Amino acid sequence: MEKLLSVIIPVYKVEKYISKCIESVIDQTYKNLEIIIVDDGSPDNSGEICEKYARKDSRIQVIHQENQGLSGARNRGLDRATGDYITFVDSDDWIHPNMYEIMMKQFGDSQIEIVVCDYQEVLEGQEPAKVDICKCSKTIMTEKELDNGYLMFEKKTRFVVAWNKIYKRSFFDDIRYPVGKIHEDAFTTYKLLNKAKGVLYIDIPLYYYVIRETSIMGEGFSDKRLLILDALIEEMVFFEIKQKYKVLGLVFLDYRDYLIDYKKKIKSENEYSLDILKPYFSVLNKYLVKMKKMQIPLKKQIKSFIFAKFHIVIL
């Protein structure tokens, strides 16, 4: 019998998009689904639209709650979920009709505990490019390869976001998303990946990520962006405690590159003082002495040292 997959859909103020999202889930070729929709205090008709679908499909359950943000809505769904596996869909996105069938088949290997697929960005109002699901390639990462971390960082965004993955349910027994923070995936996904004996990556885009005109983050700098640095600091501490120094080194370089980018943006926009980055440069300096242990190449060590000490970027 097919394993039960719990699909968690947090919903807030998406009456224009939610029908397409829900229909893409209920039309999946993989049928053994528990669809948990969390209406996070939507002020529009989103909750009512969700209830309409629940009356038509017994696999759907709708939870209504006071607004707690994306993390709070996901956590409420996790508390309710009873499936063998967990996945998420953002309520303004949609998915390929074969997504769950293709991904759930990969769990036949006992070592595979998380399956990841590629995704495609779709501008609001447009349709995605067609994909040939027969021409996908797969990469299996064992625990040792995950500790090296290279593929995870080569395809960085794909391994940070929550919604292009299917996870073993037990991975969430002691993990929840941080309420009140944006970039919640950056605070959480690495902990889930660290639990896995094996991760399988499928290189075809089965998830359609909608780029809306009213996206949370613009291109400019905002102090909210510093939460990415906070998440990376937590991640560095996590991998240092685990003594996984290769992954730690990759997170360190990621942290450094974000700092470089934010410093440039602050200087060019003149809306914030560079003093806002002082605590983050202190963290960068703290890790300089560990670069050799993190197996960072010499050229990157030099670039990191010069930037940390003199705030100068060399190519």
Question: What residue ranges belong to the model's regions?
Answer:
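Donor-binding/catalytic cores of nucleotide-activated saccharide
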Residues: 70, 91-199, 214-223
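A conserved acidic beta->alpha catalytic loop
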Residues: 24, 31, 39-48, 66, ...
